[in-house]
Amino acid sequence: SGILNSSFHMTIYFYKVWQPYGCFSNFSLHSIEMDNTFWSTVEHYYQAQKFLGSPDEKIIPVIHQACTPEEAAALGRCSTRQIRSDWEVAKTRIMREAVLKKFSTHSDIKEILLSTGDKLLVEDSPNDYFWGCGANKTGQNHLGQILMSVREELRILSMKAVAN
């Protein structure tokens, strides 16, 4: 819980797409290309990956074609479907790969991410204690941690590009 209790002005909270820093949300309409397939949002891709190699793999094209990220999320969260056996181990890596691709692909939001400097980025989700901070700010904030890691990677890459 200590990481989220640092001084408030050094923290950027994000959650809904239409709010400040909404491009940090996985629901933002920034497409990514992963494994030669275009996905409308990070959320579409992430939810589909839950079923790769599972008995319910047939849901992947349905998630891919979902009209909105909300629909993709609902399809991926359906508790009657069987997700891949390694999901708990793989999900953070998969999310990071998708987030890195999103910010590498779209220079406008890459600049927004880089403009946050060294500020703490926190997904202000009231009901997600893994990806976000949860209602009482004690969540693990894995999405915020991924964004900060991607920000550092992109900063290093942009400094190398300037140096060359």
Q: Would you name each region that the model predicts?
A:
Residues 1-9:
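N-terminal amphipathic/basic-hydrophobic helices that include classical n-h-c signal peptides
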Residues 8-164:
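Charged, low-complexity intrinsically disordered segments
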